[in-house]
Regions:
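Surface-exposed amphipathic alpha-helical tracts and adjacent flexible/coil segments at the periphery
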Residues: 1, 13, 19-23, 32, ...
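N-terminal active-site wall of soluble small-molecule enzyme domains
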Residues: 6-25, 29-66
Length: 268
């Protein structure tokens, strides 16, 4: 059950009621981001496990330790983390379950730490209503304060740029490294706003990758061929192997519309 928003003071009492109602449904866990909400869940429904959301942006073992001490059983680490850092967290907290994102959209900021959507559209990312303003086409201007002139910067005549647009994460080719690390307990695939076709294909591809790894016949090309049939904005392995700022291929400045080699034509 997801409760990973960041509530205002005026919503605390409603949140308490919400947690009680959710607990009655006996979910496997609450996915929470805010430290105060973690504590509230522990007080109201101590029988429900707490999984820390990727929105909490955990990148190191110090932050992980804080949440472990609060009673968090599993951390979905930040999308921006490297496998080396995941292994370091596991080394310091061997009993903490670690879940990583392996596939799906990426934020151009640390996950959800962006107010562009809130400022332009009144829709706040960390409150579950991001309008994906980073996917819009923007036009750049250069100004001259002395003369008061403004010049439009163009890569092509009349064409703007998708300067904030991130590619999609795709770590299927790195499943062997991830599982070899012994530090990861669960793999997470983004499903929000995705089609049933997308969910089915991605889940199938990663299930095959995991099973093939344990069977000793890991074939990255096979999984990638299947994954490229889904809608995507171009793929990147993000920061799993490379730390932030060491990679330059995580942005797609050419287009924001998701493209795939297959189109769904009907449901059977």
């Amino acid at each position: 059950a997801t409760i990973n928003g960041f509530p205002f003071n005026s919503q605390i009492e409603l949140l308490k009621t919400h947690i009680k109602k959710m607990a009655e449904l006996k979910p496997d866990a609450f996915i929470v981001a805010a430290p105060g909400v973690v504590r509230l869940c522990r007080e109201i429904a101590p029988q429900i496990d707490i999984h820390l959301s990727t929105q909490a942006n955990v990148l190191n073992y110090l932050d992980a330790q804080v949440f472990w001490d609060m009673g968090v059983k599993r951390i979905v680490v930040a999308r921006e983390i490297s496998l080396k850092d995941v292994m370091e967290i596991k080394k310091h907290l061997p009993d903490m379950e670690i879940e990583i994102f392996v596939h799906g959209s990426m934020c151009f900021a640390y996950s959800g730490r962006c107010l562009i959507s809130a400022v332009q559209m009144g829709r706040v990312p960390n409150r579950g209503s991001c309008a994906n303003d980073c996917r819009f086409e923007y036009t750049l201007y250069a100004g001259n304060d002395e003369h008061g002139s403004l010049f439009r910067l163009e890569e092509e005549p009349g064409v703007g740029t998708y300067i904030f647009n991130s590619k999609d994460m795709n770590l299927a080719s790195h499943i062997q490294e991830i599982l070899d690390s012994g530090a990861v307990d669960s793999l997470k695939i983004e499903g929000r706003t995705k089609s049933p076709y997308y969910a089915a294909v991605t889940a199938k591809a990663y299930r095959e990758a995991i099973d093939d790894y344990y069977a000793g016949k890991f074939e990255p090309e096979k999984y990638q061929k299947e994954l490229h049939t889904t809608k995507n904005r171009g793929f990147t392995d993000a920061y799993l192997i490379h730390k932030p700022f060491e990679k330059t291929d995580s942005q797609n400045h050419d287009y924001a519309l998701s493209k795939g080699s297959y189109e769904v034509t009907g449901l059977v």
